[in-house]
Regions:
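NAD(P)-dependent Rossmann-like dehydrogenase/reductase catalytic/cofactor-binding core
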Residues: 93-182
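Rossmann-fold dinucleotide-binding core
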Residues: 1-57, 61, 67
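Helix-loop-beta segment of a Rossmann-like dinucleotide-binding subdomain
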Residues: 9-24, 73-82, 130-139
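Short, contiguous strand/loop micro-motifs
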Residues: 24-25, 87, 121, 140
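A short secondary-structure junction motif
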Residues: 44, 70-74, 177, 181
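Active-site-proximal catalytic alpha-helix in oxidoreductases
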Residues: 55-83, 87-100, 126-127
């Protein structure tokens, strides 16, 4: 047993992370609670926004993560390396589109314009040296969020009869990599 406590922290790299708060179909009391939470966050100087549609905000972030985490993990490359390769860049774009189609079928309300915004982030805003937590965990043989960023999407797509061929392929490929790393 260690003689000192372990300390953990999260380091934000880049400026694309943002905190959204809200409640789906909030009652008046729940809306007031969201405003109170917002005031607390503001008082602590934590930048955030109240989402008009929290489900759409969650799905939009999920769409980004499905492409970002899956492509970096599958190829064990940085964002810059993915951008430089026309094939992996095109796959990133396809994963964004497939994820959006699932969100649309699920009724999340993510605007279609988000597709190009997320793809634009990939080409112009993400740090070229960026890697993903999924990538680092898989290639280090640690437990990962593969089921969160790929398994769930593939299962939801099947449930909603949405074809996601590349997502299925990447999920299968990553499952094989994970089994070899174990």
């Amino acid at each position: 047993m260690p003689t000192h406590p372990r300390h953990f922290s999260i380091t934000q790299i880049g400026n694309l992370a943002s905190l959204r708060i809200g409640i789906k179909n909030a009652s008046k009391e729940q809306s007031e609670n969201v405003l109170e939470a917002s005031a607390l966050l503001s008082g602590a100087h934590i930048h955030h926004k109240i989402a008009d549609n929290i489900i759409a905000a969650i799905w939009r972030k999920y769409i980004l993560n499905c492409a970002y985490n899956i492509t970096t993990a599958r190829y064990n490359r940085t964002i810059g390396q993915l951008r430089e390769d026309p094939e992996t860049a095109a796959q990133y774009e396809t994963l964004v589109r497939e994820s959006w189609l699932v969100s649309e079928a699920a009724g999340a309300g993510v605007p279609e314009t988000s597709i190009n915004e997320i793809i634009d982030q990939f080409y112009h805003k993400l740090d070229p040296a960026s890697t993903s937590s999924l990538q680092r965990d898989i290639w280090a043989g640690r437990p990962s969020e593969l089921e969160t960023f790929s398994g769930y999407l593939v299962r939801k797509a099947k449930e909603l009869s949405v074809p996601v061929l590349l997502s299925e392929t990447m999920y299968s490929d990553l499952q094989k990599i994970v089994s070899k790393q174990s």
